[in-house]
């Protein structure tokens, strides 16, 4: 059982960016809005991110970096942080998953898991 002091949940909403995509050049742009909800009992700072991006051909790219969109937000207990970002893929369908490395107010580091989510051009999946 996980410690309730360190409970961070992540939700994702995605959308295809047709105006920034060039299908004839295998360039498909997607935006995603992520909400990081601190359901633990301690404030926690989002230190870094780790993404695993898999395209429709099975090619995998890993991305690691500090914070999110240039920030390392401190999220109070019971509060959330929402941000938007994006990615470009060479296939019409793919998925992303990963984790955020968090630092609780008491000094404990822990991971907040980002469950796999799909990126897809509308109509690409039946």
UniProtKB/Swiss-Prot annotation:
GO terms for biological process: error-free translesion synthesis. InterPro entries: ApaG_domain (IPR007474), ApaG_sf (IPR036767), Uncharacterised_ApaG (IPR023065). Gene3D superfamilies: ApaG domain (2.60.40.1470). Residues 2-126 form the ApaG domain. HAMAP family: ApaG (MF_00791). This is Protein ApaG.
């Amino acid at each position: 059982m996980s410690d309730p002091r360190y409970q961070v949940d992540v939700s994702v909403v995605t959308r295809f960016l047709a105006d920034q995509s060039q299908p004839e050049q295998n360039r498909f742009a997607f935006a995603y809005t992520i909400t990081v909800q601190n359901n633990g009992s301690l404030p926690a700072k989002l230190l870094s991110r780790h993404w695993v991006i898999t395209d429709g051909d099975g090619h995998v790219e890993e991305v690691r970096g500090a914070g999110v969109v240039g920030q390392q937000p401190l999220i109070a207990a019971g509060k959330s942080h929402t941000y938007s970002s994006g990615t470009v893929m060479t296939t019409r369908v793919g998925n992303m998953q990963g984790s955020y490395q968090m630092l609780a107010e008491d000094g404990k580091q822990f991971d907040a898991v980002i469950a796999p989510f799909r990126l897809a051009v509308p109509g690409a999946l039946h």
